[in-house]
Every structure is written in structure tokens, then in C-alpha cells.
A protein has these predicted regions:
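Short beta-strand segments
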Residues: 17-50, 56-58, 65-69, 77-79
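A generic "binding-loop/recognition-motif" signal
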Residues: 50-51, 131
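Short, basic/aromatic recognition patches
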Residues: 1-19
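A short beta-loop-beta micro-motif enriched in histidine and acidic residues
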Residues: 51-53, 121-122
């Protein structure tokens, strides 16, 4: 089993931007959505339109799963297919208005739209706070070690 610290896992999360957000609809149906996030201070921040279906689902049930996909490749041989490494965790999602955020974080999230009042007015920020443990696959191990599922798996507490 891969030995990882909480700090190492957070570093990998902070160095990436894409994840898959899992949630449950009001009808108890599983749903997932690919999202782009910003990680800061032990939370992940995701922008969305206020009227998006994922926002409605999260308002009804804040319990989520999030899987960060970390691209892997063989140096100098990009045609060889290698599965992505992953970090998966459970979390609690809350909804925040863009104006409730620190200005620097708002700029990181909305980039060129950070000063666009109309865009911000129709947006909401999903804040995911991880709970429990990070479950990893292929993080902190070589490509060869990823072939061994026992060596490739790892766990680390969300909070140190």
C-alpha cells in the first residue's frame, strides 16, 4: 500500500483542476458531473450557474463524493495508454454567493469574469469540505507499481 501523508495528497489536489463530483438527486438517483475546481485552505471551490441541476441536487442533499483524476503518461512515449491516478473522498457541499468569497479566491475561480457583475449575479459557488479519508490509486507510486493494485492503493486522513 502506498504510504502518503495528508500534506502530500493535498499538494496533488492543489496541483490539479479537474474532478468528477458525485451526488444524489432529490429522487435518490445517482448523478455525476465533471467539474473544474480551485483548492484552498482544505476545501474545494467550484463555480456553477445558480439554476444548474447540480446546484438543485446539492441543495437537497449536501453529501457528495469527489474523484480527482491525475493524468499519467510514459515519458517520451505518449502513445502508450496509462490509466489516470485518482484521489477519491466524501465531503459536505455548501452553496455560497461569489460576493461571500475572499476577492483573491473569487478572481482565481472566475478569472476574466471576476469583475463581471452580471456573470457573478447568475453564479453560485459550490464549496466542498472533505471528510474522513482520502482513498488514492496511483498517487506517489511509479507507473510500474501502478500495475500492482496493492502497491498502488493508499489512504490518508483528510485532516492531519
Amino acid at each position: 500500500m502506498a504510504t502518503l501523508t495528508t500534506a502530500q495528497v493535498w499538494k496533488v489536489i492543489e496541483d490539479n483542476i479537474f474532478a468528477v463530483l458525485g451526488m444524489v438527486s432529490a429522487k435518490n438517483e445517482a448523478r455525476t458531473a465533471g467539474i473544474v475546481y480551485v483548492a484552498q485552505a482544505g476545501k474545494l471551490y467550484i463555480t456553477s450557474d445558480k439554476d444548474a441541476w447540480k446546484v438543485r441536487h446539492l441543495a437537497a442533499n449536501p453529501h457528495v463524493s469527489l474523484t480527482v483524476a491525475i493524468p499519467k503518461s510514459v515519458p517520451l512515449m505518449p502513445w502508450i495508454k496509462v490509466p489516470a491516478a485518482t484521489i477519491t473522498f466524501a465531503g459536505i457541499a455548501t452553496l455560497a454567493t461569489p460576493d461571500a468569497l475572499d476577492p483573491e479566491l473569487r478572481r482565481r475561480l472566475f478569472q476574466v469574469f471576476a469583475d463581471d457583475a452580471a456573470k457573478l449575479a447568475q453564479s453560485i459557488v459550490i464549496v466542498v469540505e472533505p471528510v474522513g479519508e482520502f482513498v488514492t490509486y496511483g498517487v506517489g507510486v511509479s507507473l510500474m507499481e501502478m500495475r500492482d493494485t496493492v502497491k498502488a492503493r493508499g489512504r490518508a486522513p483528510v485532516k492531519a
